[in-house]
Amino acid sequence: MISLLQKTKILSNTPSRAIIQIDGVYPGYGITLGNALRRVLLSSLEGAAVTSFRVAGVAHEFSVVPGMYEDVIQLSLNLKRLRFKVFSEEVEKIRVAAKGAKKITAADLDKNAQVEVITPDYPIATLTDPKASLELELTIERGIGYILAEKRKRKEKLPIGTIELDANFSPVTRVNISVENMMVGERTDYNRIKLEIDTDGSLDPVEAFHQSLGILMEQFQALRGDVDSPKVKEQESTFAVLEKREDIKAIPVSEAKISARTVNVLTKHRIKILGDLD
């Protein structure tokens, strides 16, 4: 019988990093379970990202903003790095307006009750001219995984001057797994899994672990509904064996694949069919 796992241990936990240990994993299951958890953690959890932006006076990404050190392409790269925690299911807008020579960071974004800026120190742009100004509007959405701008389906046309971005929604930035042997009872080949989970700070890493477990369990539960019950299969198999056994008992000794000498001996003892041997 395959034993169940032991209790999960949280070795360390911060807002953006956790180390989780799973003991008593059945031999050989460590890599299987660890890789499955890693894939789900990196690809299947919901997060928030900038999906598009508009700059006042800019028509496309190849434009130049007077007095701004970065071009619009570099600006878009900076915006993709920003991380947010969004509390609503709706698309959120957030703005920043700046004048004069200064460095603009995510901390300068206007306050929004539904949006928490996780990376306030990340740079957005640098104005080098005292007379320069920048008016910027960001669109922030929730999503799963990495979605290219051209793959994103829109229900309505975007305003002129809107620049769409490829969006990395995943709140998990890194997952490292290690598997080692441990002793359970008298066996020394059971597995111990250690998971190191790093997030962008918008999702607690232990909560990310629990969400990934939930996703895997839902997937396997869905599969279970399409598979015949093991007990039913076992019962059907038993009946088939019994029926086959009864058929064999009905075979006449003369037709059985045995030697003529054995047939003569059995016939002498009045054994006519194989069932008489019981």
Describe each PLM feature range.
Residues 1-273:
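Protein-protein interaction/assembly regions in multi-subunit complexes
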Residues 275-278:
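C-terminal tails and terminal domains of large nucleic-acid-associated
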